[in-house]
């Protein structure tokens, strides 16, 4: 081999070896998938606002994370613990007037109502259950099992 060809070959090998770690490192970079964790948007109804959801793990995580930001959270499940949707909900104020009426499209409802005492009635499969909640500082959770 001619000396100039050997020099060229050696330069190419040394250059490739110098760049190889960068190439391997660039190929092994893992970019995590971005999963949206946004709860559905609020709806108006009666004297308050609400949002129901929690179907699917991403939405459930987002809804549970948002519970602390709302005066009232409603959870619906079967006695076995399986999540439940299509629950008819009526919230009445201390005077017995309907403050909010909705049908949940998921096992979690986040409710924004003014401070006060409310009776929450939830109905599923012909069974109606009720709980009294007092809203003020902090957030409250009413858990309904059917």
Where are these regions (language model features)?
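Short beta-strand segments within Ig-like beta-sandwich modules, predominantly Fibronectin type-III
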Residues: 99-104, 133-134
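Primarily secretory-pathway and cell-envelope proteins
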Residues: 25-87, 124-146
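Bacterial N-terminal signal peptides
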Residues: 11-20
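Short, surface-exposed beta-strand/beta-hairpin micro-motifs centered on an aromatic residue
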Residues: 106-112
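Bacterial N-terminal signal peptides that target proteins for export
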Residues: 2-12
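Short amphipathic beta-strand segments in non-cytosolic proteins
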Residues: 88-99
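Hydrophobic loop/turn residues within beta-sheet-rich immunoglobulin-like superfamily modules
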Residues: 113-116, 136
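A short tyrosine-centered beta-strand micro-motif
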Residues: 116-122
